[in-house]
Amino acid sequence: MTELEQKFINARRQAIALDYANLNDMQQQGTMATEGPLLLLAGAGSGKTTVLIHRVANLLRYGRGSDTDEIPIPISEDEVAFLEAYAAQPTPEQRPLMQYLCAVEPARPWEVLAITFTNKAANELKERLERMLGEEARDVWASTFHSACVRILRRDIEQIGYSRDFTIYDTDDSKRVVKDCLKELELDEKTFPVREIVSVISRAKDEMLLPEDFRAYWEKNNDWRKIRIAKVYSLYTKKLRDANALDFDDIILLTVQLLQSRPEVREYYQRKFRYVLVDEYQDTNHLQYLLTSLLAGGYRNICVVGDDDQSIYRFRGANIENILSFEKEYRGARVIRLEQNYRSTQN
């Protein structure tokens, strides 16, 4: 690398960093480290949502410009001098040229998948991105796990034997179907409570245990009660399939099965999503871990944000091991800790 090229790269990073001058050092690093696997460890009040929003904005404005030594355009001393002057005293008139010089393959909005755990968090992400970037932010895939999977299934579920107009069953629907199954199998609800069976089926799906696998496991262990629950699980699955219906767990399970079994579908989404971001990663369960691994398997540009000290979703099968083993799963991953607590500071 020539001295001129090094000066340009340094000036480019300084110019981009001005966009995030209101962030602290670690937040700025989390925003500008765009390439490869990244683990952001962030407790409550550390500004992680702000980092996620700035990170997406950075990807759309500059692509990998803040995290590469690549120079895709011819440069001279003039470009270096311009960026150095901009970094010292920026003006609005200079901004278009600055963005042109600093951008390296900026991501298109639909190439960014940002997954959150709640609709409220997803909507907040969309609203704040739109305020920052305008209408183009609407095309970012900012959604919950279930919403993202429904979009994928509406496009491709026919490849695994369902029709695209599938119905989604809520918890009450699932309980109703389980009740019907118990009645058909002549099993007493007092011995086999509906809520318990719904929970057992949900956990089985999270572990990708299909009815036949579930039954074989408990037959091997000679568990009379679980063998009967396996019969309920099998009949429950048949009833949903006959109705072209999915329960909440099926939405993610079938998406994972689709991506695993159909290489062309998997490759389509791996090409589509250049950048995958996952919030509250410590709360992901086994299926959600598999899903994000599959979707990020093309570019490996996956950024996960989480707190390694808490897991409020443990009752839903959350596996905190997903965050603790991230560096082992993704060789070469960078780890950044957002340790300053702004809520405490404000108090």
Language model regions located:
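Conserved coupling/interface region of RecA-like P-loop/ASCE motor cores
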Residues: 119, 180, 310-347
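Conserved helicase/translocase P-loop NTPase motor core
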Residues: 22, 89-98, 145-149, 227-275, ...
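Short, conserved "post-DEAD/DEAH" coupling segment immediately C-terminal to helicase motif II
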Residues: 286-301, 318-325
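P-loop NTPase Walker
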Residues: 1-163, 168, 267, 321, ...
